[in-house]
């Protein structure tokens, strides 16, 4: 991987993107979402190949679920673009301001970071979501996904670039997908001081720890999951049951799916039987002695 060439192109793109108006960026994102829709069949075919290869290599079904795309997930990607387009442009927003005793006015203003690297695992939807968030906030993005999702990610990158080229002011150099041949590429990204401005790991604890320990560039560390739901004695129990069900079953393989439910002991006898009944045959419950 020619990290010098890739990052130079991304740096140039980020300089242009930082100067774009909200309407220019939104127009480009709308064009990209249309391109993903037009390329839906190609993206799903590429993903089917990744899933086939993963199963042949013996990947567990829980990991295959994370890797898989379907029409519903493509719809979700397109919906996320619409949501991001509808949001206020963060660039130039004044967060705080004050005047010093000496009469100097100081303002705290949001500005783009520059080149953002995302190191992530086998979820191809991250390719599209991360790009959209980066582009809206005026940043170019260097993506390094899992080798298991390479065909899906390449198809998504191609659709994104097509959408940017079709937009009047789109900057198609604002996205680059790093190859997935070996782990040396990840190290090249994480040690590209002055070329990559920040890295974000998106995955499990092992990946996050590797990024934090290897990086010589700034890292925004994310959570690794192990999500808890607490049900207090004052809770609406029907609402709590529905929240628990949704948080566990909507996407069980997602890192924000709950693993643990903590219940106030004063409502154990009221809540736990209803929880067992709702989850029966669908979710395995492992309860403590209480």
Positions of the model-derived regions?
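Short gly/ser/thr-rich secondary-structure transition/capping motifs
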Residues: 95-102, 180-182, 242-244
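Phosphate/pyrophosphate-binding betaalpha-module
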Residues: 147-222, 227-241
């Amino acid at each position: 991987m020619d990290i010098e060439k890739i990052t130079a192109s991304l740096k140039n793109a980020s300089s242009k993107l930082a100067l774009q108006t909200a309407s220019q960026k939104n127009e480009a994102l709308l064009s990209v979402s249309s391109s993903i829709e037009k390329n839906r069949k190609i993206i799903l075919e590429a993903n089917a190949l990744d899933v086939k290869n993963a199963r042949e290599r013996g990947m567990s079904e829980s990991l295959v679920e994370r890797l898989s795309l379907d029409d519903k997930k493509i719809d979700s990607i397109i919906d996320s673009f619409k949501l991001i387009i509808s949001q206020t442009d963060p660039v130039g927003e004044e967060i705080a301001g004050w005047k010093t005793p000496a009469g100097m006015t100081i303002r705290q203003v949001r500005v783009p970071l520059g080149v953002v690297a995302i190191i992530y695992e086998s979820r191809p939807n991250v390719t599209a979501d991360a790009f959209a968030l980066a582009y809206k906030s005026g940043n170019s993005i260097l993506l390094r996904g899992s080798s298991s999702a390479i065909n899906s990610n390449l198809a998504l990158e191609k659709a994104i670039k097509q959408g940017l080229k079709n937009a009047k002011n789109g900057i198609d150099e604002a996205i680059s997908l790093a190859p997935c041949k070996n782990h040396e590429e990840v190290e090249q990204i994480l040690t590209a001081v002055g070329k990559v401005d920040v890295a974000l790991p998106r995955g499990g604890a092992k990946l996050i720890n590797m990024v934090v320990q290897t990086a010589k560039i700034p890292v925004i560390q994310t959570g690794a999951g192990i999500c808890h739901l607490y049900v207090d004695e004052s809770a609406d129990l029907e609402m709590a049951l529905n929240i628990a069900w949704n948080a566990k079953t909507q996407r069980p393989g997602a890192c924000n799916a709950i693993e643990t439910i903590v219940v106030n002991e004063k409502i154990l006898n009221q809540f736990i039987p209803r929880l067992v009944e709702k989850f029966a045959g669908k979710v395995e419950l492992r309860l403590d002695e209480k």
